[in-house]
Amino acid sequence: MAVLADIKGVGLGLKRELIPQIQRLFNDKDVPDSKIANINFVEIAPENWIGAGGKASADLAWFVERYPIACHGLCLSLGGPDSLNVDFLKQVKQFLSANKIPLYTEHLSFCSDIQNGKAGYLYDLLPIPFTEEAVKYVAQRIRQTQDLLGQRIAIENTSFYVSAPISSMAEIDFLNAVLTEADCNLHLDVNNIYVNSINFGFDASQFLRRIPGERIVYSHIAGHLQVDAGLLVDTHSENIIDPVWALLDEAYQLFGVFPTLLERDTSIPPLPKLMIEVNKITDIQSQYASNNSPAGQYQSGVRSRP
């Protein structure tokens, strides 16, 4: 069974169109192992796989046998006004156990609302107001989630485009307060830091330096769409730009090497082109191979809380 420490090195988001490409290269004896050797783990959204049967179930089983898997949720709505979806979390718990998946993460956002007494999904990830009240509310829901799952989760810093007018805290202060109050781990999204820094005019490096590095379990890096000079959209559809690569490099300098996953959700190129960015992450990590444990918190590339 995979354990948290197996999530290490470089990962790739597992999209349906990539499955046959990875399987073909993995099974082709005439293809050098180095073609996909730098894919050390994969990530899936549990919502897309819970209850899957037939070929989808067989594909998942194939990856479970060959790769450590991280689950990155989409619809828990940690900041939502409706009650936490306990039935869904029970499904997640069973899914994690059945597929030997050691890690579950979610977005620090909300994607549900209540109208006329009925809860419904908004199909987008929206920012939580950055207030002390929201810190306590979200942290309680994270603790409840951890209790129901019987394990720690990690929350991801999200991109957003409109800040709530009632916010009274900076994003980094809100994030750190939630992490402390909930005592959970951090799923660090490097591209989201950069996107928000451009959209809201703060220094991405200063934000990064205030991250509690000992809570990082793994990170995302991705491309984004530039709409205009002051507006970036986190589309996961483009190649990663140099300032985002530089921010990842800076994060490794600050915190040591942590597992990092390439996100590509739309306009997905053939696997060999994706491997160019996967291999670049590996190259950057190799520059800091002797800096895996600056504070003694890393274990096999994954930090754990004492």
Predicted features along the sequence, with ranges:
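Boundary/entry segment of secreted carbohydrate-active catalytic domains
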Residues: 2-26
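Hydrophobic faces of well-ordered beta-strands that scaffold small-molecule active sites
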Residues: 8-14, 40-44, 69-72, 104-106, ...
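Acidic-and-aromatic substrate-binding clefts and catalytic sites of carbohydrate-active enzymes
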Residues: 17-20, 45-56, 77-87, 161-169, ...
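Acidic (Asp/Glu)-rich catalytic clusters
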Residues: 23-37, 53-71, 87-102, 146-148, ...
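Gly/Pro-rich active-site loop or hairpin
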Residues: 51-53, 83, 125, 129-132, ...
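Active-site acidic/histidine proton-transfer and metal-coordination neighborhood
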Residues: 85-185
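Acidic/histidine-rich catalytic cores of soluble enzymes
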Residues: 146-231
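C-terminal helical cap(s) of enzyme catalytic domains, especially alpha/beta-barrels
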Residues: 270-291
